[in-house]
């Protein structure tokens, strides 16, 4: 515990908020153009080819965004919507593409958790 004299000399410092997704500039989502669409491998215990895209946002920032779901139609110059949310086993990937919005098509034949992948309700 600090003494009163120590607190007079140097007051307590309030903890500063640090955003987990700074490129969004406090927006819920951001639009951007894919500059490169490629696959990458995850960190140590996991093994896969994860689909990611390098995206230039409307505020001129370049970020790496994860493309969720099975299969996608994205290529260079595709316009996508980006939301926050990191991928734990991909270092440097701190954003997700929103499926079913702009040029990113929803996941085909998706039955469960459809709203997360932009899939329409299947006909009964």
From Swiss-Prot:
Residue positions, PTM 3-methylthioaspartic acid: 89
GO terms assigned for molecular function: rRNA binding; structural constituent of ribosome; tRNA binding
Region of interest called Disordered, as start-end residue ranges on this chain: 1-25
Taxonomic superkingdom: Bacteria
GO terms for biological process, alphabetical: translation
Database matches in InterPro entries: NA-bd_OB-fold, Ribosomal_uS12, Ribosomal_uS12_bac
Keyword annotations of the record: Methylation, Ribonucleoprotein, Ribosomal protein, RNA-binding, rRNA-binding, tRNA-binding
SUBUNIT field: Part of the 30S ribosomal subunit. Contacts proteins S8 and S17. May interact with IF1 in the 30S initiation complex.
Family: Belongs to the universal ribosomal protein uS12 family.
PANTHER family assigned: 30S RIBOSOMAL PROTEIN S12 FAMILY MEMBER
Record's protein name: Small ribosomal subunit protein uS12
Species of the source: Stenotrophomonas maltophilia (strain K279a)
């Amino acid at each position: 515990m600090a003494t009163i004299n120590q607190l007079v000399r140097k007051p307590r410092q309030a903890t500063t908020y640090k955003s987990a997704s700074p490129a969004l500039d406090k927006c819920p989502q951001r639009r951007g153009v894919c500059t490169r669409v490629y696959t990458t491998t995850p960190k140590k215990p996991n093994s896969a080819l994860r689909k990611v895209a390098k995206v230039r946002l409307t505020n001129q920032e370049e970020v790496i965004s994860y493309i969720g779901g099975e299969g996608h139609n994205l290529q260079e110059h595709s316009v996508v919507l980006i939301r926050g949310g990191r991928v734990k086993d991909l270092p440097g990937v701190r954003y997700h593409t929103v499926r079913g919005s702009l040029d990113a098509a929803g996941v085909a034949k998706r039955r469960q958790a459809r709203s997360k992948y932009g899939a329409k309700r299947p006909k009964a």
